[in-house]
Amino acid sequence: MAQQTGILGIRGTVGGLVFRKDGSISQKPASNRAAFQSAPGLARTRENAAEFGLSAKYSKLLRDSLRVAIASASDSRLASRLTKAMREVIGLDDTNDRGQRVFDSSNSAPLLGFNFNAGAGIGQTMYFPYEVTGAGADVTMTIPALNPVSDIAAPQGTTHFELVFAASSLDMEMLTFTNAVVAAPLGILPVNSPALVNQTLVASFPAAPADANLVVGVVGINFYQQVNGKFYPLNNNSTNPLAIEYVA
Protein backbone atom coordinates (compact mmCIF):
# COMPACT_ATOMS: atom_id res chain seq x y z
CA MET A 1 0.00 0.00 0.00
CA ALA A 2 1.39 3.43 -0.97
CA GLN A 3 2.18 5.96 1.77
CA GLN A 4 2.47 9.74 1.42
CA THR A 5 5.82 10.81 2.90
CA GLY A 6 5.50 14.55 2.36
CA ILE A 7 3.53 17.16 0.50
CA LEU A 8 4.37 15.49 -2.82
CA GLY A 9 6.32 12.44 -1.66
CA ILE A 10 4.83 9.01 -2.26
CA ARG A 11 6.37 5.65 -1.41
CA GLY A 12 4.85 2.33 -2.48
CA THR A 13 2.65 1.16 -5.33
CA VAL A 14 -0.05 3.16 -7.04
CA GLY A 15 -1.82 1.45 -9.92
CA GLY A 16 0.91 -0.12 -12.01
CA LEU A 17 3.73 2.16 -10.77
CA VAL A 18 6.20 1.66 -7.92
CA PHE A 19 7.40 4.84 -6.11
CA ARG A 20 10.68 4.27 -4.24
CA LYS A 21 12.22 6.13 -1.32
CA ASP A 22 15.02 7.51 -3.52
CA GLY A 23 12.47 9.15 -5.80
CA SER A 24 12.73 6.67 -8.66
CA ILE A 25 9.63 5.29 -10.36
CA SER A 26 9.25 1.96 -12.18
CA GLN A 27 6.49 -0.23 -13.55
CA LYS A 28 5.13 -2.85 -11.18
CA PRO A 29 6.61 -6.23 -12.17
CA ALA A 30 4.33 -9.01 -13.31
CA SER A 31 3.50 -11.64 -10.71
CA ASN A 32 5.71 -14.70 -10.54
CA ARG A 33 2.78 -16.86 -11.63
CA ALA A 34 2.06 -14.69 -14.67
CA ALA A 35 5.73 -14.73 -15.63
CA PHE A 36 5.88 -18.49 -15.21
CA GLN A 37 2.87 -18.99 -17.46
CA SER A 38 4.17 -16.78 -20.26
CA ALA A 39 7.98 -16.83 -20.29
CA PRO A 40 9.23 -18.71 -23.40
CA GLY A 41 12.31 -19.88 -21.54
CA LEU A 42 10.17 -21.72 -19.00
CA ALA A 43 8.22 -23.80 -21.52
CA ARG A 44 9.90 -27.08 -20.54
CA THR A 45 9.43 -26.29 -16.86
CA ARG A 46 5.72 -25.63 -17.41
CA GLU A 47 5.35 -28.93 -19.26
CA ASN A 48 7.12 -30.84 -16.50
CA ALA A 49 5.02 -29.13 -13.84
CA ALA A 50 1.78 -29.97 -15.65
CA GLU A 51 2.65 -33.65 -15.92
CA PHE A 52 3.94 -33.82 -12.36
CA GLY A 53 0.70 -32.30 -11.09
CA LEU A 54 -1.34 -34.84 -13.02
CA SER A 55 0.85 -37.67 -11.71
CA ALA A 56 0.19 -36.48 -8.16
CA LYS A 57 -3.57 -36.56 -8.81
CA TYR A 58 -3.35 -40.10 -10.19
CA SER A 59 -1.26 -41.16 -7.19
CA LYS A 60 -3.80 -39.78 -4.74
CA LEU A 61 -6.67 -41.44 -6.61
CA LEU A 62 -5.01 -44.86 -6.39
CA ARG A 63 -4.13 -44.37 -2.74
CA ASP A 64 -7.69 -43.32 -1.94
CA SER A 65 -9.12 -46.33 -3.77
CA LEU A 66 -6.98 -48.73 -1.72
CA ARG A 67 -7.14 -46.78 1.52
CA VAL A 68 -8.24 -49.71 3.69
CA ALA A 69 -5.46 -52.01 2.50
CA ILE A 70 -2.82 -49.27 2.57
CA ALA A 71 -3.74 -48.26 6.12
CA SER A 72 -1.90 -51.31 7.45
CA ALA A 73 0.98 -51.39 4.94
CA SER A 74 2.65 -48.16 3.88
CA ASP A 75 5.69 -45.98 4.50
CA SER A 76 6.26 -42.24 4.91
CA ARG A 77 7.40 -41.80 1.29
CA LEU A 78 4.53 -43.70 -0.33
CA ALA A 79 2.93 -40.63 -1.91
CA SER A 80 6.14 -39.45 -3.57
CA ARG A 81 7.14 -42.95 -4.71
CA LEU A 82 3.74 -43.63 -6.25
CA THR A 83 3.70 -40.21 -7.92
CA LYS A 84 7.07 -41.05 -9.48
CA ALA A 85 5.66 -44.34 -10.79
CA MET A 86 2.63 -42.55 -12.24
CA ARG A 87 4.95 -40.04 -13.89
CA GLU A 88 6.73 -42.94 -15.56
CA VAL A 89 3.41 -44.23 -16.95
CA ILE A 90 2.49 -40.78 -18.27
CA GLY A 91 5.87 -40.63 -20.01
CA LEU A 92 4.85 -43.65 -22.10
CA ASP A 93 2.00 -41.71 -23.75
CA ASP A 94 3.12 -41.48 -27.39
CA THR A 95 -0.02 -39.69 -28.62
CA ASN A 96 -0.22 -36.36 -26.80
CA ASP A 97 2.32 -33.55 -26.79
CA ARG A 98 4.78 -33.04 -23.95
CA GLY A 99 3.01 -31.34 -21.07
CA GLN A 100 -0.34 -32.77 -22.18
CA ARG A 101 0.41 -36.47 -21.82
CA VAL A 102 -2.04 -38.51 -19.75
CA PHE A 103 -2.45 -41.94 -18.19
CA ASP A 104 -3.24 -44.74 -20.63
CA SER A 105 -4.11 -48.07 -19.02
CA SER A 106 -2.30 -49.89 -21.82
CA ASN A 107 0.93 -48.36 -20.45
CA SER A 108 0.33 -49.37 -16.83
CA ALA A 109 3.01 -52.10 -16.70
CA PRO A 110 5.41 -49.93 -14.63
CA LEU A 111 2.91 -50.14 -11.76
CA LEU A 112 3.10 -53.93 -11.61
CA GLY A 113 5.05 -54.99 -8.55
CA PHE A 114 4.86 -51.56 -6.90
CA ASN A 115 5.39 -52.01 -3.16
CA PHE A 116 3.34 -49.77 -0.89
CA ASN A 117 5.60 -50.43 2.09
CA ALA A 118 9.26 -49.95 1.19
CA GLY A 119 10.29 -51.52 4.49
CA ALA A 120 8.62 -54.88 3.83
CA GLY A 121 8.80 -56.74 0.55
CA ILE A 122 6.41 -59.41 -0.74
CA GLY A 123 9.31 -61.51 -1.99
CA GLN A 124 10.92 -61.58 1.45
CA THR A 125 7.71 -62.49 3.26
CA MET A 126 5.44 -64.69 1.15
CA TYR A 127 7.04 -67.85 -0.23
CA PHE A 128 3.97 -69.64 -1.54
CA PRO A 129 2.81 -69.71 -5.18
CA TYR A 130 -0.19 -67.64 -6.25
CA GLU A 131 -1.63 -66.05 -9.36
CA VAL A 132 -3.85 -63.01 -9.86
CA THR A 133 -5.98 -62.83 -13.00
CA GLY A 134 -8.90 -60.76 -14.25
CA ALA A 135 -11.97 -61.52 -16.35
CA GLY A 136 -15.21 -59.57 -16.70
CA ALA A 137 -16.21 -58.07 -13.36
CA ASP A 138 -13.86 -60.28 -11.31
CA VAL A 139 -10.23 -60.19 -10.24
CA THR A 140 -9.24 -63.61 -8.90
CA MET A 141 -6.37 -64.81 -6.73
CA THR A 142 -5.63 -68.53 -6.77
CA ILE A 143 -3.35 -70.24 -4.25
CA PRO A 144 -2.47 -73.88 -5.05
CA ALA A 145 -0.90 -74.50 -1.64
CA LEU A 146 0.00 -72.50 1.45
CA ASN A 147 1.73 -73.84 4.53
CA PRO A 148 1.87 -70.93 7.00
CA VAL A 149 4.66 -72.52 9.03
CA SER A 150 7.11 -72.73 6.14
CA ASP A 151 5.73 -70.38 3.48
CA ILE A 152 5.38 -67.16 5.49
CA ALA A 153 8.34 -65.32 7.01
CA ALA A 154 6.52 -63.90 10.02
CA PRO A 155 8.36 -61.43 12.26
CA GLN A 156 9.18 -62.41 15.82
CA GLY A 157 6.20 -62.25 18.13
CA THR A 158 3.61 -63.03 15.46
CA THR A 159 0.77 -65.34 16.47
CA HIS A 160 -1.61 -64.71 13.56
CA PHE A 161 -1.60 -63.45 9.98
CA GLU A 162 -4.17 -62.15 7.52
CA LEU A 163 -3.85 -62.47 3.77
CA VAL A 164 -4.81 -59.19 2.08
CA PHE A 165 -6.40 -59.16 -1.36
CA ALA A 166 -8.17 -56.15 -2.87
CA ALA A 167 -8.98 -54.65 -6.26
CA SER A 168 -10.12 -51.29 -7.57
CA SER A 169 -11.16 -49.83 -10.91
CA LEU A 170 -10.07 -46.26 -11.61
CA ASP A 171 -11.45 -43.82 -14.15
CA MET A 172 -8.31 -41.77 -14.77
CA GLU A 173 -10.16 -39.11 -16.73
CA MET A 174 -12.96 -38.41 -14.25
CA LEU A 175 -10.70 -39.22 -11.26
CA THR A 176 -13.22 -41.60 -9.70
CA PHE A 177 -12.91 -45.20 -8.54
CA THR A 178 -14.94 -48.30 -7.73
CA ASN A 179 -13.83 -50.93 -5.23
CA ALA A 180 -14.34 -54.64 -5.70
CA VAL A 181 -15.77 -56.77 -2.89
CA VAL A 182 -14.08 -59.97 -1.71
CA ALA A 183 -17.01 -62.12 -0.63
CA ALA A 184 -15.06 -64.83 1.20
CA PRO A 185 -11.67 -63.69 2.53
CA LEU A 186 -9.53 -66.18 4.41
CA GLY A 187 -9.66 -64.04 7.55
CA ILE A 188 -7.15 -63.98 10.41
CA LEU A 189 -5.40 -67.34 10.85
CA PRO A 190 -2.81 -68.70 13.32
CA VAL A 191 0.72 -68.84 11.93
CA ASN A 192 0.82 -72.51 12.90
CA SER A 193 -2.41 -73.38 11.03
CA PRO A 194 -2.60 -76.52 8.91
CA ALA A 195 -1.65 -76.18 5.26
CA LEU A 196 -4.23 -74.72 2.89
CA VAL A 197 -4.75 -76.09 -0.62
CA ASN A 198 -6.55 -74.86 -3.73
CA GLN A 199 -7.74 -71.58 -2.27
CA THR A 200 -9.55 -69.06 -4.49
CA LEU A 201 -10.30 -65.46 -3.57
CA VAL A 202 -12.55 -63.44 -5.87
CA ALA A 203 -12.83 -59.65 -5.84
CA SER A 204 -15.99 -58.66 -7.72
CA PHE A 205 -17.01 -55.28 -9.14
CA PRO A 206 -20.68 -54.35 -9.58
CA ALA A 207 -20.07 -54.51 -13.35
CA ALA A 208 -17.17 -55.13 -15.69
CA PRO A 209 -14.86 -52.07 -15.66
CA ALA A 210 -14.68 -49.91 -18.78
CA ASP A 211 -11.84 -50.78 -21.13
CA ALA A 212 -10.19 -47.40 -20.54
CA ASN A 213 -10.18 -47.83 -16.75
CA LEU A 214 -7.13 -48.87 -14.79
CA VAL A 215 -7.88 -52.07 -12.86
CA VAL A 216 -5.49 -52.83 -10.02
CA GLY A 217 -5.24 -55.91 -7.81
CA VAL A 218 -3.08 -55.86 -4.67
CA VAL A 219 -1.80 -58.67 -2.48
CA GLY A 220 -0.30 -58.40 0.97
CA ILE A 221 -0.18 -59.84 4.44
CA ASN A 222 -0.86 -58.37 7.90
CA PHE A 223 0.75 -59.72 11.05
CA TYR A 224 -0.83 -59.76 14.49
CA GLN A 225 -0.11 -60.75 18.06
CA GLN A 226 -3.04 -62.16 20.00
CA VAL A 227 -3.29 -61.14 23.65
CA ASN A 228 -6.32 -62.08 25.77
CA GLY A 229 -8.41 -62.75 22.71
CA LYS A 230 -7.58 -59.45 20.98
CA PHE A 231 -5.46 -59.02 17.86
CA TYR A 232 -2.83 -56.29 17.96
CA PRO A 233 -0.97 -55.15 14.81
CA LEU A 234 2.67 -56.16 15.05
CA ASN A 235 5.42 -53.50 14.98
CA ASN A 236 2.93 -50.76 14.09
CA ASN A 237 2.36 -52.48 10.73
CA SER A 238 5.94 -51.73 9.63
CA THR A 239 6.51 -55.37 8.63
CA ASN A 240 3.35 -55.75 6.53
CA PRO A 241 4.00 -55.99 2.78
CA LEU A 242 1.49 -54.91 0.12
CA ALA A 243 2.15 -54.85 -3.62
CA ILE A 244 0.36 -54.40 -6.93
CA GLU A 245 0.17 -57.87 -8.45
CA TYR A 246 -2.33 -57.21 -11.24
CA VAL A 247 -2.91 -54.32 -13.64
CA ALA A 248 -5.15 -54.07 -16.69
Segments and roles (model prediction):
Residues 1-120:
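Long, polar/Ser/Thr-enriched low-complexity segments
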Residues 33, 42-44, 50-53, 83-86, ...:
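Glycine-rich loops and low-complexity Gly/Arg-rich segments
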Residues 90-236:
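Charged linear interaction tracts used for macromolecular binding and regulation
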Residues 233-247:
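Low-complexity, polybasic segments enriched for Lys interleaved with small residues
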